[in-house]
Swiss-Prot record:
Residues 1-9, 65-87, 136-141, 197-209, 263-269, 316-336 are cytoplasmic. It is found in: Golgi apparatus membrane. Changing M20S: No effect on CDP-ribitol and CMP-sialic acid transport activity. This is CMP-sialic acid transporter. GO terms for biological process: CMP-N-acetylneuraminate biosynthetic process; CMP-N-acetylneuraminate transmembrane transport; N-acetylneuraminate metabolic process. The lineage of its organism: Eukaryota, Metazoa, Chordata, Craniata, Vertebrata.
């Protein structure tokens, strides 16, 4: 059970960020491996749907542990889930956006190298920064804005001449991959800040909020699954192409999603940047060892700029873990 937000220790924050980093790096490499080695390619949409189901089941179990008794557990579900259609509707917004993001992420990674995907995905930082300013009434310092533009420059270098794998040859469509990652980035920025605002605007349990979001998420992803792959699924089956590696990827995605909600609840979206920077390094090293990735100079410089910008962005001059209620338009855009 996660501690109360007021009593969160530095160790707990570091623990969550460390686990989130390792899971993100492992997920990127493992997903890339399944997409390049599978003899029969599975449906990525079904994997996203199953991920939502697993996250829901884990959240239900954690809520039961948090409440401590069957009676309080039933009362909590009845009050906050079954008896709160308004709250379910509120949490359906990020679940819908996250569903789109997850599907776009699967599509992007199928058409991009693992390291390119991981670095390019960091465009969610400037998108998140803008959403934070507009939605949470926070201010960003000039140094933070500089780091945002530095990040854009780094990602541009990565896209200009991306690294190429030499040992694994896979038919890819980079244009489709970058288009999918752009949509995923926009979804990530909005949904992350929206969910943070919902979590920190009330004392409702984190696991209750997760259950509310994942319930609608299952409906959304299941509908999306049959809209995009319905005919093939009926012909080949829902679990077509599934292997132990695919289930491992789904498990990593589920754990990563849960830890992301914990990090957002007890720190903020800015702290997620540190995790992303470390994941870039780890996934790149893994790609070199496993896929024979050749790092070009432009890719290396771009990755370096991304890591430095994420570090600078994570050095705010103010407390960014709580929502400010008052801020002028000028302060929100420029900051001090």
């Amino acid at each position: 059970m996660a501690p109360a937000r007021e009593n969160v220790s530095l160790f707990f924050k570091l623990y969550c960020l460390t686990v989130m980093t390792l899971v993100a790096a492992a997920y990127t490499v493992a997903l890339r491996y399944t997409r390049t080695t599978a003899e029969e390619l599975y449906f990525s949409t079904t994997a996203v749907c199953i991920t939502e189901v697993i996250k829901l089941l884990i959240s239900v179990g954690l809520l039961a542990k948090e409440t401590g008794s069957l009676g309080r557990f039933k009362a909590s579900l009845s009050e906050n889930v079954l008896g709160s259609p308004k709250e379910l509707a509120k949490l359906s917004v990020p679940s819908l956006v996250y569903a789109v993001q997850n599907n776009m992420a699967f599509l992007a990674l199928s058409n991009l190298d693992a390291a390119v995907y991981q670095v390019t995905y960091q465009l969610k930082i400037p998108c998140t920064a803008l959403c934070t300013v507009l939605m949470l009434n926070r201010t960003l310092s000039k140094l933070q804005w500089i780091s945002v533009f530095m990040l854009c420059g780094g990602v541009t270098l990565v896209q200009w001449k991306p690294a190429q794998a030499t040992k694994v040859v896979v038919a890819q469509n980079p244009l489709l991959g970058f288009g999918a990652i752009a949509i995923a980035v926009l979804c990530s920025g909005f949904a992350g800040v929206y969910f943070e605002k919902v979590l920190k605007s009330s004392d409702t349990s984190l696991w209750v909020r997760n259950i509310q979001m994942y319930l609608s998420g299952i409906v959304v992803t299941l509908a999306g699954t049959y809209l995009s792959d319905g005919a093939e699924i009926q012909e080949k089956g829902f679990f077509y192409g599934y292997t132990y590696y695919v289930w491992f990827v789904i498990f990593l995605a589920s754990v990563g999603g849960l830890y992301t909600s914990v990090v957002v609840k007890y720190t903020d979206n800015i702290m997620k940047g540190f995790s992303a920077a470390a994941a870039i390094v780890l996934s790149t090293i893994a790609s070199v060892l496993l896929f024979g990735l050749q790092i070009t100079l432009s890719f290396a410089l771009g990755a370096l700029l991304v890591c430095v910008s994420i570090y600078l962005y994570g050095l705010p001059r103010q407390d960014t873990t709580s929502i400010q209620q008052e801020a002028t338009s000028k302060e929100r855009i420029i900051g001090v």
